UniProtKB/Swiss-Prot annotation:
It comes from Rattus norvegicus (Rat). It comes from the Eukaryota. Keywords: Acetylation, Cytoplasm, Initiation factor, Phosphoprotein, Protein biosynthesis, RNA-binding. GO terms for cellular component: eukaryotic 43S preinitiation complex; eukaryotic 48S preinitiation complex; eukaryotic translation initiation factor 3 complex; eukaryotic translation initiation factor 3 complex, eIF3m; synapse. This is Eukaryotic translation initiation factor 3 subunit D. It holds the Pfam family eIF-3_zeta. InterPro entries: eIF3d. Residues 285-299 are annotated as: RNA gate. Residues 523-548 are annotated as: Disordered. Residues 529-548 have a biased composition (Acidic residues).
Length: 548
């Protein structure tokens, strides 16, 4: 017969649970656990982390804290992968940057301590002399910019406008400090030889445009002729009977204001008998307008970025062409010069030709130089009494006010226009000097400047007109510190150097990274159309070889 067996009850007078571990469970490891815990968690995010160690174990739970029941996967070679842990190489200007900075700071501190120690040991008169020497040294460094800035960004070397070949010989070298000292006063009054073309009248409604009444810039499809000197039929005709130096206003303005230039440029010089012709290369970037060229930190974007120097130059040229035509009364009455435009064919529509007039002028530079220049006007303007004034129309464009220490035109143009023009003079000194020289050579009464900005900072295809400003070329030249005597002195110096050369073709090249211009002698056939075709064929062959 079954009977009830009373179990053994362990009495624990001091707490709960059994008093001792049974024999069968004595050597078995134990870990506090919860039925809600997963076995072998990849990462345990349940444990709270406390910054203060006083609360590390006070509110934490022991459940899930051990790894006795965790599942570990055995080594599986199929899931093995190589990981590239090589350190990326730093660029040259970043390498040891902080170490050099600390070294420079430590050196400056030691130098100051040494100066202070020397001052303490010197007598009173010697102290005054030492302080005066230090003051003059700081003044010199401030004036001439001999200050070492360890955090200053390194400027990358700029490319030359044309590749200098090994068979080119340097005939002359002129540095900018030398050219800035040139002066020439024996310049005769200009004489008009021939005037060609037709001009449209300026629309004075553009003078009333403000930042609050901005006007969109329209794309106007008109033909602009940028004919070089030797391709000009009028200059060819005049060269048979008069003159011994021939050029265009853009080429002469480049030479006359060259001491302000930063980027590389080049001009072809042809010595034919006793005559001198200044030309530009075909398919060159000579006519592109630079942007922020003379800024402390000019744009340095590369590739297809719309803020790269070349794309900014193309954008500025596009804006300048469109604004110079949009601000005129297009399709209405024109001011006609005695002779027609020499570059327009008979079957071309006159409305498709840009408003431009050419004035061929003659200067006497001493007794031996007879200079003939083709100058340009962009428009004509009538005064209060009906008098006619010829004007040159140019455009300043804002691409991003956050760069080159710029100011926001939409905020400052109406109230602080002086600050805007001062900033532009600092960032585009060379371009403004070229425009001023062109206006002075052409004899224009006024120089019209348009202020055009992007519709959006990151959109280089749409622009708006924010305002205009008018200057007299002579007054503007003095305002931007452009010395006319120095400009003529530089030109006379270049002409004298080229006149001493033998017959042939030469190249005036601005060094891309130095304040120097050099005169190279070129072999026969350089920059000819046949040579350009051969270069293009070689480039195509190289591209085909790379593709294959």
């Amino acid at each position: 017969m079954a009977k009830f067996m009373t179990p053994v009850i362990q009495d624990n007078p001091s707490g709960w649970g059994p008093c001792a571990v049974p024999e069968q469970f004595r050597d078995m490891p134990y870990q506090p656990f919860s039925k809600g815990d997963r076995l072998g968690k990849v990462a345990d995010w349940t444990g709270a982390t406390y910054q203060d160690k006083r609360y590390t174990n006070k509110y934490s739970s022991q459940f899930g804290g051990g790894s006795q029941y965790a599942y570990f996967h055995e080594e599986d070679e199929t899931s093995f992968q190589l990981v590239d842990t090589a350190r990326t190489q730093k660029t040259a200007y970043q390498r040891n940057r902080m170490r050099f900075a600390q070294r420079n700071l430590r050196r400056d501190k030691d130098r100051r301590n040494m100066v202070q120690f020397n001052l303490q040991t010197l007598p009173k008169s010697a102290k005054q002399k030492e302080r005066e020497r230090i003051r003059l040294q700081k003044k010199f460094q401030k004036q001439f910019g001999v200050r070492q800035k360890w955090d200053q960004k390194s400027q990358k070397p700029r490319d030359s406008s044309v590749e200098v070949r090994s068979d080119w010989e340097v005939k002359e070298e002129m540095d900018f400090p030398q050219l800035m000292k040139m002066r020439y006063l024996e310049v005769s009054e200009p004489q008009d030889i021939e005037c060609c073309g037709a001009l449209e009248y300026y629309d004075k409604a553009f003078d009333r445009i403000t930042t609050r009444s901005e006007k969109p810039l329209r794309s106007i499809k008109r033909i602009f002729h940028t004919v070089t000197t030797t391709d000009d039929p009028v200059i060819r005709k005049l060269a048979k009977t008069q003159g011994n130096v021939f050029a265009t206003d853009a080429i002469l303005a480049t030479l006359m204001s060259c001491t302000r230039s930063v980027y590389s440029w080049d001009i072809v010089v042809q010595r034919v008998g006793s005559k001198l012709f200044f030309d530009k290369r075909d398919n060159s970037d000579f006519d592109l307008l630079t942007v922020s060229e003379t800024a402390n930190e000019p744009p340095q974007d590369e590739g297809n970025s719309f803020n790269s120097p070349r794309n900014l130059a193309m954008e500025a040229t596009y804006i300048n062409h469109n604004f110079s035509q949009q601000c005129l009364r297009m399709g209405r009455e024109r001011y006609n010069f005695p002779n027609p435009n020499p570059f327009v064919e008979d079957d071309m529509d006159k409305n498709e030709i840009a408003s431009v007039a050419y004035r061929y002028r003659r200067w006497k530079l001493g007794d031996d130089i007879d200079l003939i220049v083709r100058c340009e006007h962009d428009g004509v303007m009538t005064g209060a009494n009906g008098e006619v004034s010829f004007i040159n129309i140019k455009t300043l464009n804002e691409w991003d006010s956050r760069h080159c220490n710029g100011v926001d035109w939409r905020q400052k143009l109406d109230s602080q226009r002086g600050a805007v023009i001062a900033t532009e003079l600092k960032n585009n000194s060379y371009k403004l000097a070229r425009w001023t020289c062109c206006a002075l050579l052409a004899g224009s009464e006024y120089l019209k400047l348009g202020y055009v900005s992007r519709y959006h900072v990151k959109d280089s295809s749409r622009h708006v007109i924010l305002g205009t400003q008018q200057f007299k070329p002579n007054e503007f030249a003095s305002q931007i510190n452009l010395s006319v005597e120095n400009a003529w002195g530089i030109l006379r110096c270049v002409i004298d150097i080229c006149m001493k050369l033998e017959e042939g073709k030469y190249l005036i090249l601005k060094d891309p990274n130095k304040q120097v211009i050099r005169v190279y002698s070129l072999p026969d056939g350089t920059f000819s159309s046949e040579e350009d075709e051969e270069d293009e064929e070689e480039e195509e062959e190289e591209e085909e070889e790379e593709e294959t």
